[in-house]
Regions:
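Sequence/fold signature of self-assembling virion shell proteins
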Residues: 16-57, 170-190, 216-316, 321-428
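Hydrophobic alpha-helical segments involved in membrane association or supramolecular assembly
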Residues: 73, 133, 137, 209, ...
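Short acidic, glycine/tyrosine-flanked loop/strand segments centered on an H-E-D-like triad
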Residues: 95-123, 360, 365-366, 370-371
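A generic local secondary-structure boundary/capping motif
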Residues: 61-62, 195-200, 238-240, 384
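Beta-strand elements of well-folded, non-transmembrane domains
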Residues: 77, 117, 399-403
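Structured, hydrophobic secondary-structure cores that serve as assembly/anchoring elements
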Residues: 67, 107-123, 127, 192-221
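N-terminal "assembly arms/tails" that initiate or stabilize quaternary assembly
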Residues: 2-105, 411
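Alpha-helical scaffold segments that mediate packing/assembly in large oligomeric complexes
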Residues: 119-197, 214, 275-278
Length: 428
């Protein structure tokens, strides 16, 4: 059964159920009352919405009805300056509004839980309610990740500089980021300046940054930091908002992107160079690599010595018999016993955190209301011969979702490490 309507939480009092109003042969397993439909749907949305941190700043569009799988976002071009003086009594030529349509294809996502307990329809069953809450959180995190992964593809990326003895060293690649390369107040000011220079519109008067708690830990210790309660009321605070710096409001989320390479084999996160290499494209390693692991290594990035390489292929073998073939020629002396790290993170595979800086209408998302996110409840007895003893019920969610970058200059990201947490954080 699909549930679409959203009603205020105060309607929960309508769950009082009068068995006298039901048909004489009503058993409690034939249908859901409208009030219970409402409750389950509200519960799902209430649990999903706090997790949609990346969605809340996008240009929202309803799910297209009857128009296939394509949704349209709109980008409006700025008007040129009107510098020509008006002539008395003469009507000047007018201009036109330039609108660019940007389309995206929607996809459907969903999940369900099978319940073996009896679904009691004369009262709200706690098991179903708890399942709906868990599903709501899962739906929110799923849809938030879909949006996050789209907008994290922005190519407007800056890397935090490394700092040693008070001297900054520019970083131009993710794999060079170390624990000293942190998000600083100066970097925040640089991002705000870039957005202002692009004439990017603010969101309710400020720009917004989505930041991981581990990165916020470093930034919040700055004396210029303002906690959220110091500049806004609880009614106007964003979901996850923690504070503000130089015209940028920071929203904290554990789903802010963390970049770190997976272990290179099932038994070892890192590999070890067996034989010194200073040319060619082959590295012999000490660890055993299975045929399945060798196939999975093709295309992976690694960090060895002081450079990043891409694995073209790997030859399986027992300990001291496996090799890696690289796409690039080895351009330095790599001595025996040098550690080979996964190369998708920072230096030596430190976790790298991506902080997004956003202006208004930087990207578009589909709404979860109006059919974007639905609760599906199947009571026991609804499966026919597939459930001959009426032993199972289910509750799940289904969503139609897409996201799209609309104006790349309005979306910036900074990749940095955390002084305390980059060694232990995991990719998400």
């Amino acid at each position: 059964m699909t549930i679409n309507s959203i009603y205020p939480a105060t309607w929960l009092q309508l769950f009082a159920y009068d068995p006298q109003s039901q048909p004489p042969n009503y058993t409690g397993s034939e249908r859901l009352t409208p009030e219970m439909k409402t409750y389950y749907d509200m519960t799902l949305l209430d649990e999903a919405q706090p997790n949609l941190v990346h969605d809340q700043f996008g240009q929202k569009r309803p799910i297209p009805q009857g128009s296939g799988k394509t949704i349209e976002f709109r980008k409006f071009a700025a008007l040129v300056k009107a510098l020509t003086p008006l002539t008395e009594g003469v009507t000047p030529d007018g201009g036109e509004l330039t609108v660019t349509a940007i389309t995206a294809t929607v996809s459907q996502f969903g999940y369900f839980i099978v319940q073996t307990d009896v679904l009691e329809l004369t009262a709200i069953d706690n098991t179903i309610v708890e399942a709906t809450k868990l599903l709501g959180r899962q739906a929110g995190l799923t849809l938030d990740t879909i949006t996050r992964n789209v907008i994290q593809a922005s190519t407007n990326v800056s890397y935090a500089p490394k700092v040693s003895g008070g001297t900054e060293t520019e970083v131009t690649h993710r794999y060079d980021l170390d624990e000293s390369a942190q998000l600083t107040v100066d970097l925040v000011q640089q991002m705000v300046t870039k957005l202002r220079a692009a004439n990017a519109p603010t969101i309710n008067g400020d720009y917004v940054a989505i930041i991981h708690p581990y990165v916020a830990y470093d930034l919040m210790r700055d004396p210029e930091w303002q906690n959220a309660h110091q500049y806004t009321t609880s009614e106007n605070i964003y979901a996850g908002e923690i504070g503000k710096l130089y015209g940028c409001r920071f929203v904290q989320s554990t789903e802010a992107l963390i970049l770190k390479g997976d272990p290179l084999t099932a038994a070892a996160e890192n590999l070890t160079v067996k034989t010194e290499a200073s040319s060619g494209t082959t590295l012999a390693v000490k660890e055993a690599i299975s045929a399945e692991e060798a196939a999975a290594l093709a295309g992976r990035k690694i960090y060895v010595g002081s450079k990043q390489y891409t694995i073209a292929s790997a030859s399986s073998g027992s300990a001291n018999a496996a090799t890696l073939t690289l796409e690039e020629t080895i351009a330095e002396t790599i001595t025996a016993n040098t550690v080979v790290y996964p190369g998708e993170g920072g230096k030596n595979n430190l976790a790298v955190f991506s902080t997004l800086f956003l202006a208004k209408d930087a990207y578009g998302v589909t709404e979860i209301e109006g059919g974007g996110l639905q609760t599906i409840v199947k009571q026991k007895g609804s499966a026919g011969t597939a459930d001959p003893l009426d032993q199972r019920s289910s509750v799940g969610w289904k969503a139609i979702k897409t996201a799209k970058i609309l104006i790349p200059d309005y979306l910036l990201r900074v990749e940095s490490c955390s002084s305390r947490y980059s060694k232990t954080a995991k990719a998400n």
